[in-house]
Amino acid sequence: MLKISATKKRLFGFIILGWVLLLISDRIGELRQYQGAFVAMYTLAIASIILLTGYSGQLSLGHSALMAVGAYAGALSVNNFKLHPVIALIMAALIAGVFGLLLGYAAARLSGPYLAGTTLALAVSLPTIANQFPVLGGEQGLAFDIGLPPARLGEDFSQYQWFFWISCSSALIMIWFLANLLNSRYGREFRALRDNPTAAQLAGINIGRQKALAFSLSAGIAGLSGGLLVMLISGVSPSAFPLSLSFLLLAGAVVTGVYSLKGVIIGALVLVAIPEIAESVVSRIGGSEGFTTSLPGFMVSSLLILAVLFTPNGPGHFLHKKKHLKH
């Protein structure tokens, strides 16, 4: 019997998923297309945290800053260098990846709360840094317009469907790449680094290099998600990447399960669905302005507690374990 390698199985699976998304995009409204694009963006952002924290054991509290690096890189690529928006998204990932590589080497000797504090300081200082350089647009930020969809896609092909295609294609390609990477030698070295750095070093693994590599890859994926975010909101400014975004992404990673990519889309769906659910609850039962503002945060916090109590390794691991118990 012909055996298919795990890499080919993943490729076939992602191709089928891409085909399903392509079919779905013609059958859903513009609102769902827009929300689907946000799900794809959050999927990438959460995956970048899972790579850094869950696989290499490095805790970042400032991933919103890495997203901002990619966002500004993408906007500058379009506005100043007149690059095609899709090329600008690639530049967003590359420049954020280089920034992450430099940061990774600088923080290679840091771990635990020291590394978390460093990334937190970066996220806190982002608005001040952005406001110091006129080329970044100050508080007003920069516009980011990807233009109209290609004419060959037809007159009925909307801007929101174009957003959906770009975001989902980016997420599928990057998650496929990441899944293959984490099942390769690099993934094994990342896990060794996470579980026991001393033993990993004795086994011949270059700790500093692998930490920097993980940071660079994570930053590149976060930068791409930042580029997708500013594409969806048509501009980039410091206010688009608050510190609260970093904590929201961490919550999404915990709901997903930080040690696996299997349920990453679940965490992304949760982050997109909660504001809509909260709005629906408020419209039904009413409430003060403070209640309306705090309800989404309360719902995320409650879900976070439930996830830690009942699915600490994520829903993907839970379903996988349940499937094996049946057999």
Locate each region found by the language model.
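Transmembrane alpha-helices and adjacent helix-loop boundaries
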Residues: 1-327
